[in-house]
Amino acid sequence: MSNFWDNNKGSIMSGLASAGKYGYQGTKYVAKAGYKASKTHYNNSQGKKNVEESSDEGYMSESASDLSHLQDPKMFPPPPLKPGQKQISSDGTVIDAGNAPLVHTAAVPMANAASHPGLPPRTPTANSIPMLTQQQTYPPQNMYQQQPPPQPPMQQQVPPQVQQIPQPGQQLSQQPMQQLHPEPIPPRNYQTAVETPPQYTPIPSLNAQHVQEQLQQQLQQQFQPSMGTPDQGQALVQGSPLASQQQVQPQVQPQTSQYQSQQVPSPQIQNQGQLMQQQQNYFQPQLQQTQPQQYIDSYAQYQQQGQQQVQPQIQQMQPQVQQQPIQQPPQAQPQYQQSYPPQYQQQTQSLQPQYQQPVQAPIVQPPIPQQDYYQQQQQTPYQPASQPQMYQQQPGQQNPIVSPAPALAQRPSLSNIQTSTGHGASQESTVSSTASITVKPYVWMDSDERKEKKKIELQPVSAIDIHQVTPPLHKDRSSSSSLKSSSRDASVLEKGKSLSPGPAPLPSRNVRPPTSVDHTKPNTVTPAAATGTSAEVGDDQVRPNESITGVYHESTVSFPPPPKPTHNGLPMSPPVSHARPTVSHKPPNPPRPPVSSKPTLPPIQTHQRITSTERAPIGRPKEEVHQAAVLGAYNYNVDVGFAPPPKPPRSMVTSPANDPQTSLSSRRPSQEYGGVAKASSRTLPPPPGQQNGSLPQHTEEEPASNSSESAPPAMRMLPLADLPPPPQRTDSHTTTSEQPAVPSRTFDPPPRYSTNETIPPTYNIDEDIQTAHKKPPPKVPKKKVSLRAGNKPPVPKKKASLSGTATHEHNESARTSLTQETNNSIDDDDDDDSGEGNSFRKYLRHVVPAERDHIHKSK
């Protein structure tokens, strides 16, 4: 065998090495594959939720990007237009979507365009008007004074001519007659394309300043190329023939009031009004709207020239307009008047004849002088609907500058012609009055930042000022004497006035001067006042102690301070000589103090008298000194001559303590335990050694029992160390002659002990509990007379027959005999002392029912 290992050792080792190598590689591969499979299974089943959460976190982190890397909004193309929509780009060109029928959709939001100046603004066209006219289904809240009730059948179609708005610079006389007089169309055109006063109802404005600022920039861009020179503006104003004004006069009476406030404004006014309508949920009311100073000087010359040309023409129309019947909507809601520039005055005069026919003429878009337009908006008066004198304004009158809620680009009406004439007459004063008006530019910021900026900053108030100012009284609270402020309120109020200008108290609060304060007690100051006003408040201004409001008359209290407590929490009372004769060693209880709402005092030490002038310790505050409800001094030195109450007659007869032949040693235990007969059942007694040591002390106190001091003692719980042991139960072998009497309620001495007269027996708690709960032995029942050894059981009688009558008679006889036997056995139980009880008594014969005798059948 040794040769085999030597010859094949190399091959065996190489085989084992290769086998171990490939085995390890295979095991490793299988382990990796199993681990991957188990991990995949875990992620697909149990760990799927965790994987989703991690993927969500990764998505959120990747999606967050910087706004600076985003594309400029100016690079995006304008949004698509629906049929019938129009849009004005940033360069002023009008983009028309076509003459297709209008689609009743909501207006395009303009909030984002207003906030980003680079974006081309969307111009609200007639497409947005039908949605706004739907508001007329509700009772109109704010309407123009000349606006008639809505007409539902006039809201269906719009002619294509309404959508055509010529460029500024064109004159009204150059319009072709085909556009001025097209084919007859349904009369709803006036409502759809013209009647949009609900759009310009006063709306609270938050971004009104910024919107108007952008509109002014756009209008200025359009105004400069189309305006040219002031001469061109005059030509435009003068281009309207006066014949068009004369045509209005004979036809104004039936219909002019209907269309006075239904003129279609220019796209700029529509844009501004639409922006205000869309932002009504975020706007805030503003009483006056201002404009930048830069527009005042640029338009001053044009305003002056334009108004001078229009004023004589307007004055010619006033007599006819004043004779028109005023049609007002049946409502009491506040109405508004709006004024507009002279260009609108001329155009409305020239367009009035066309409104007589069911035709809408295209509207010229003139350059609007910004200064006059906004100034007249600011000076628009607020008048309720119940005033019929709107058309009776004189040219020389100037309306007060009272703007409705935010200044909106409201629709011009015919009634405002008189307002503009007043402006023309007082142009110089208007320019000078608005020279100081500026517009606060709108600053784009986040909504959270805006909320933080609009928060009302409250000035921090120190705690010292709060404590120094008294709270105000309710207006309905009476100022009776019971509710008058205390001295603390008065002193604090005076100090608060001198230190900080806090809120003044109500005049109805009666402040009384500070009452007298006990200067013997230390002045206490609250922590707030002590920390912050130590340098400001002197010793003479120290705040008095808090108390109940009202006048408090302090009087002397003669109660002494409580005695020092002992180790067991009860005050120690020294021995007193005025005790009862039978229990002279026991100190009597002092009389209780009168009943009061405050905690009562412990028992007063009678051997020490404290004068009524003695105060509490100086270091103790006033609140800790107990005071009785009944104020005044009580003289404890008065001698009371009442004799102690007599003893009950029973205790006098049965108590061995009254026996004159009883020795002193035999009376000691009875005297010691007499006063605590009932208290012994509540607490545990001390060891007997302490009782023995206290006997000589009681012996010395006994001669002083003849003192005639009165005050019958009241029952009081003694400490645990002074309680005696309870009387031990007497066994059956004790003689009946020495049985004690029942202790009376006057705590007479307990019985003497027969074993030892001087020292009571040792009290064992366990033994007493065992004897108390030990039951007497059970009584052994005696044997019956019939079951005794000398007696034989009775022989049952033979049954006569099996008939029912015989059986009944047998049962009756059996019951009678068994009842007699039972009575006899019960009577003999007391005489039989041998044997145990009969356990078969419950199986008596009368208990078992009688059965038929199948064996002894009668033959």
Swiss-Prot record:
Report biased composition (Basic residues) as residue ranges. 772-786
Cross-referenced InterPro entries, in alphabetical order?
Answer: Aim3
Q: Which UniProt keywords apply?
A: Membrane
Give the compositionally biased regions (Low complexity). Answer: 137-146, 154-179, 209-224, 240-290, 333-358, 372-400, 479-490, 704-714
What ranges does the record list as Basic and acidic residues composition bias?
Answer: 447-457, 848-859
Main location as per UniProt: membrane
Where does this protein reside within or beyond the cell? Membrane raft
Q: Name one GO biological process term.
A: barbed-end actin filament capping
Pfam families reported in the protein's UniProt record = AIM3
Q: Where is the composition biased (Polar residues)?
A: 225-237, 412-437, 522-534, 605-614, 652-668, 814-825
Q: Which family does it belong to?
A: Belongs to the AIM3 family.
Q: What is this protein called?
A: Altered inheritance of mitochondria protein 3
Species of origin reads Kluyveromyces lactis (strain ATCC 8585 / CBS 2359 / DSM 70799 / NBRC 1267 / NRRL Y-1140 / WM37) (Yeast)
- High-level lineage: Eukaryota, Fungi, Dikarya, Ascomycota, Saccharomycotina
Gene assigned in the entry? AIM3
